[in-house]
Amino acid sequence: MQLCAFVFLEDISGELPPYEETYLSVPMDPPMREAYRELEDEIRKALKAHRGNRSVLSIMLNTLLVYPDHPYGLGTLYGKEFDPELKRTVRFVIAEPRDLAEDGVYSKERKLVEEIKKELAEGRRCQIFAVYTTKHDVTARLRRILDNEGIRTAVLRASVDTSKREAWYARQVKDGIQVVICHPKLVETGLDLLDFPTILFYESGYSLHTLRQASRRSWRIGQRRPVRVKFLCYEGTMQTSCLRLMGKKLLVALTMEGKFAGEGLQSIDEDDDMLSAMARELVERNGIGETADAVWKALNLEHQKLFPTTSVRTDDAPFSEESIFHAQDDPAGLVGGAFDTAPILVFGRRPELPSGRRRRAKATVPEQASWFGLQ
């Protein structure tokens, strides 16, 4: 390989379609709000009674994030602590969440259906991300709700081998699937979801790396449609706190990477431990700093500055059965103009040789080129 170009998205953003992130906060239905506040109060009392106990912190984080999306079947919640008298670890009750109707469709789910129908009406397939996929399987619940609405839906499971996931997506598109649901970690690297220009984070999780990778799966070389990323959460819940703190950490991370100069370096120590930050908010009954909406608006604004999309095609016509997946633009065309006639190696392809020109049996250049002429 004589020439290889490593480019960042900002280097080719002029050739990419617009990218937009939207934060959607949904108020809870009255029965759920009452049950959630009840659970929140019980966990708050446990946090105060067992200060610094990591088992209570872990229960707090996971339970308050998943309960609004799966408000049944959680059972009694237990913490653990060492009893000096018994000289062993003992369990204690933290809370007993109230079970709501399993067959009900709640406000955030209704909002999700509304957003998906809106996107499908524009001919845009949707990718949904949810992080609770095992014991309290939110993905299966969402699929059932979408199936009942007549929306053709598939769920990507971890059982599909990494090397076969691209082919799995191609099959779903060919079979007429309109929505795919999966954990964001399953697609965070190595997949270009060009057929799914709309991404909905039904649950974000609290891994900044996973969120950053998964949110860009559609915004890649070869994408021809504007990309929309939407984050859904229940208003005034741990989901809101999590998204807001994730947004602040992302602002700090981008600032440290030199992507842009923004506020936030002073808040690294304050919000670096998300678990402690969310526990503090719960105990003190108030948010810390800006609202989640304000943080994500700031992120979106900085993104527009960082990735100006001035020379892009924004055709947003409905998709046909002949998918973009099978007819992508040649990625080399987007960067080819920046170089001379030297061939560019595109991943997965060999550079074409002019007709009549023989391939050399052995390269005459050293294995690794030297920038300074040193051997």
Where in the sequence are the language-model features?
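Conserved RecA-like P-loop NTPase helicase motor core
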Residues: 152-245, 249
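Conserved Helicase C-terminal RecA-like lobe
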Residues: 14-32, 50-180, 185-191, 262-264, ...
